[in-house]
From Swiss-Prot:
InterPro entries: MinE, MinE_sf
Sorted UniProt keywords: Cell cycle, Cell division
Highest taxon of the lineage: Bacteria
Chain segments annotated as transmembrane: none
Similarity comment text for this entry: Belongs to the MinE family.
GO-annotated biological processes: cell division; regulation of division septum assembly
Protein's name in the database: Cell division topological specificity factor
Role of this protein: Prevents the cell division inhibition by proteins MinC and MinD at internal division sites while permitting inhibition at polar sites. This ensures cell division at the proper site by restricting the formation of a division septum at the midpoint of the long axis of the cell.
Species assigned in the record: Herpetosiphon aurantiacus (strain ATCC 23779 / DSM 785 / 114-95)
Amino acid sequence: MGLLDNLFGRKQQNSSSVAKERLLTVLVHDRVHLTPHDMEEMKREIIAVIERYVEVTNPEAIEVTLTRGEAADHLKADIPLGRSRQQ
């Protein structure tokens, strides 16, 4: 997979960049006062709302993350959705 990753521009992260990313995530969680339990509850609620409108194909693959931006913190939800056929 390393060759394919290099061909398609995917970069492997070294341990220091992974550690830095994890530390930033912890800092953002602390800054917005969300516990891991609160994040999981928010994730469940987001899924429930989205499922009212579209099919969520793989709930286990959903990722909800908080990131620190220059001007504001950001909540990102990566949710795989089913495709419907055009009629």
